[in-house]
Regions:
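Hydrophobic, well-ordered beta-alpha structural blocks that scaffold small-molecule cofactor pockets
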Residues: 7-143
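Conserved S-adenosyl-L-methionine
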Residues: 1-4
Length: 143
């Protein structure tokens, strides 16, 4: 045959010696589990939102890639934060699309008189250690 473009023709033939296995349909079981987990997720974020208001969170720590998704699920543009502190100097002065909060490079002065929410979910452990070491008030969103 004469082919034009970048196409390739491949033909397969099923081996007749292989027995067919029936797939078990776990859809209803999996669907229930997904719905249950999603409901728990929504409840957890609602509690976190209440905690943010109650504790008067006014800054974030950790300008990770997931911050916009985190903010989306919190149903906020993070305007309640004065800034997000990050250890990466290249991120200083940057902003996330559709979020109000500016990223600032780590400086001891930025930590005082602030109540932080850890915003880099993948960095909760090292950020918690750093803030604990300095006796800075913070909320771990994963607890």
């Amino acid at each position: 045959p004469n082919f034009w473009g970048g196409s390739i023709l491949i033909a397969f033939k099923k081996d007749s010696s292989i027995n067919e296995r029936k797939l078990i349909n776990n859809y209803t079981l999996i669907k229930k589990k997904i719905i249950k987990n999603y409901s728990r997720f929504k409840v957890k974020y609602k509690k976190l939102n209440n905690l943010i208001l109650k504790q008067k969170i006014n800054a974030g720590y950790g300008a990770g890639q997931m911050v916009p998704s985190f903010a989306y699920h919190l149903k906020t543009d993070l305007s309640f934060m004065d800034y997000i502190v990050d250890d990466n100097k290249k991120r200083a002065g940057e902003k996330y699309p559709f979020l109000k909060t500016e990223i600032k490079f780590f400086n001891e002065k930025l930590l005082f008189n602030k109540n932080f929410l850890i915003t880099a979910l993948d960095g909760v452990i090292p950020i918690s250690k750093k803030l604990n070491k300095r006796n800075i008030k913070f909320t771990n969103p994963l607890k």
